[in-house]
Amino acid sequence: SPTQDFMRF
């Protein structure tokens, strides 16, 4: 999901 994609860091 795009919301969790920012947490891929």
UniProtKB/Swiss-Prot annotation:
Tissue localization of expression: Detected in the thoracic perisympathetic organs in larvae, and the dorsal ganglionic sheath in adults (at protein level).
Keyword flag Secreted: yes
Predominant subcellular localization, coarse grouping: secreted
One GO biological process term: neuropeptide signaling pathway
Domain of life: Eukaryota
Post-translational modification Phenylalanine amide, affected residues: F9
GO cellular component terms attached to this protein's record: extracellular region
Keyword 4Fe-4S assigned: no
Keywords: Amidation, Neuropeptide, Secreted
Compartments where found: Secreted
Family stated for the protein in its record: Belongs to the FARP (FMRFamide related peptide) family.
The name this protein goes by in its record: FMRFamide-5
Lineage summary: Eukaryota, Metazoa, Ecdysozoa, Arthropoda, Hexapoda
